[in-house]
Structures are given as structure tokens and as C-alpha cells.
Amino acid sequence: MQPIWAVGLMTGTVLDGNIDVALLKTDGETIAEFGAYALKPYPRWIRDLLEQAQAEARVWNFEGAEPAIFAEAEEALTRAQSAAVRELVEESGLSMADIGVVGFHGQTVLHRAPQAGRLGDTRQLGDGRLMSQLLATKVAYDFRTADIRAGGQGAPLAAVYHAALLRSADASGNTAILNLGGVGNITWWDGDDALVAFDTGPANAPINDFMKKRGLGEMDRDGALAAKGKVDEDRLAELLKHPYLIAPYPKSLDRFDFTEMMADGLNEENGAATLTAFTTSAVGKALDILPRRPKRLAVSGGGRRNPTMMHMLVERAEVELVPVEALGWRGDAVEAECFAFLAVRVLRGLPISFPSTTGVPEPMTGGELVG
């Protein structure tokens, strides 16, 4: 198949108020061209609606009827993200007729990993049929459910796109890709058949929630608060005994599996420092269980903008860092690009998850396609 223009959409679990939207020209196996990307802000009322949906999802916990707010939030975010797609396409001098498919991840409100004798569950808000009608184009969506039903983790799904990025940058196995969003996830590829991906632990979510809880703003901007604090090493040592951190992959996390309560009783500076140290130390433990420990990490996601977190990564995970921009990638666009890439794979019937990335029995396709 010849490469086609696809649009990818992603909104992270930290609910930073932005819709990540990116254009990518691809055949679902290689990257022909990076197109434009943008961070399009949600109206405040939609962000508030999504925060309420996320809170009600935790109470619901996959038991009984879904909260009524889901339908309201689903329609609102679908319309907002459809508008973001159209804006980006038109700003790029293209029309929707030029777009082969849109990859619509939706908003994760709850994710539950499988356990022995029990399949996992996942819920992303997003109405792919409505988006297809609004944009008059094909839409791939609901990327995780098939994987979960087959016994997989349903996450992370970025591995096959990360491998395509590494193919042109470093296919030696010496470089892994670390994404620091609400949760951290890592992809390692040996350049051949070994492709491994899993969630490393929390990333920005507990720190952001800690800041909000203390009335200090939305996030620890530039890691300024953590930089003033002292890590509670005794508490950190206890936190690092969590069984998830040494469990074998594949494995995945919900955004609330590790919370800001890990810093209860600490002052503002020391709490921020200890949570940041936990995120980075968890990455170090993740590197230790890979088939081969990479020498460097290409870091994407919002966490890469936190100098304190980056310094602690070098120090506590004992690894070299390289900005994804130095490899010719766009750190803010990688996740949205990923869902453009996966959408083309859905269109072609190619696998999007694998035994070594989500734990499914065999490489499998996924996602719903409409339009």
C-alpha cells in the first residue's frame, strides 16, 4: 500500500486540557512524512466534565450501569476532537478528502489490568461513529477492547510505532523510548524480533494531583518545587518495594494505581521531591528487567519538560538521556502520531498488539473501523 495521510488524536489521563492532534503520512509500517501537529485546548467546561467523569468512573469501577455522565462527556469530547481534526487539516492546506483515516483514541476514564482468573477492563470515552459522520471520513477507534478480551493488558499500544521510529534512529537495542505522561511507559526493540513494552510506574499524575491537593497549581512546573525539596529516602525505599515494580512484563497500570497519598505527611517541597524520585527510580527498575539494559532513553511526553525529573532520571535510573527532538521527532506529537499510525494498521488489518507488549496469545489486530 502507498502511504496515506492519517490524523491521530490523544488526550492523556492527566487531563492537562489539551487535545493532541497530529498528521502523519504512513503505510502503517514505515513513516513517510511527519505532518503538522498541534495542542488544541479544550473549553474549560469540557475539561471539568471529563474530570467529573473520571471521578465517577472510579466509583463505578466496572460494576453495574455506567455513570450517566459518560454519555454527555463522550459526545462533548467527540465534537471537540472532531473540530480539532478539521482545524489542523485545514491549517495544513489539506481537506478532509485528503485524509485516509483518523485514529481516535478517546479519553481513558478507567483501566483495570487482568489478574489471575479475571480478564482486565478498560473504558475510553469517544464515539467513533459520530466523529466519522462529523468529518465524513474513516475513523479507527476503541483500540484496546479486543486486546483486553483476548486476555491482554490493553496497554501500552505505542510499541509498534516506537519501533518504526527506532528503525531510522537506533535499531541496536541501545536506545529505548520512555514516555512520561500520567503513567510512564517504555518500549525496547532489538532491531529484530524482540519488541518489549510495559508501564514503568507513575509519571506525572501523582505529582500533578499532589500540587492540586495542596493548592499549588496544576503541576510542578519545571520541577521547581521538587528541586527545593529533600527526598525522603526511607519512604522512597519502602515505596520501591511495591510488587508491581519487579513483576515481569507484560504489565500495565491505571492512572490512579499510584496516588499522591504516597507523599502524605511530607511538606510541599519534600513531597514533590519524593514523588519525582519515585517516578524516576521506578524507571530504573524497569530498565533492569528488560532483555538488555539500554544505554540511553529517548524521552517523550510532558515529563521531559521537568528538568528536576530529567536530572533524577540520570542519577537514579543510571542512564543517558537524549531529547526526542535530537532524533528528529516531536516530543509533544509522538502519542498522537502513534494513533495515526495504528489507525492505518487497523485499516490494513495489521497487528497492533503483541505477546511481548500486552500479553495477548498472538499478534492481533484491534480497533473498530467506521466510515
Curated annotation (Swiss-Prot):
Pfam families assigned to the protein according to its UniProt record, in alphabetical order: AnmK
MF terms (GO), sorted A to Z: ATP binding; kinase activity; phosphotransferase activity, alcohol group as acceptor
Binding site for ATP: 12-20
Protein's job: Catalyzes the specific phosphorylation of 1,6-anhydro-N-acetylmuramic acid (anhMurNAc) with the simultaneous cleavage of the 1,6-anhydro ring, generating MurNAc-6-P. Is required for the utilization of anhMurNAc either imported from the medium or derived from its own cell wall murein, and thus plays a role in cell wall recycling.
Top enzyme class: transferase
Keywords: ATP-binding, Carbohydrate metabolism, Kinase, Nucleotide-binding, Transferase
One of the GO biological process terms: amino sugar metabolic process
UniProt feature coiled coil, ranges: none
Catalytic activity: 1,6-anhydro-N-acetyl-beta-muramate + ATP + H2O = N-acetyl-D-muramate 6-phosphate + ADP + H(+)
Similarity field: Belongs to the anhydro-N-acetylmuramic acid kinase family.
Protein name: Anhydro-N-acetylmuramic acid kinase
Pathway assignment: Amino-sugar metabolism; 1,6-anhydro-N-acetylmuramate degradation; Cell wall biogenesis; peptidoglycan recycling
E.C. number: 2.7.1.170
InterPro entries: Anhydro_N_Ac-Mur_kinase, ATPase_NBD
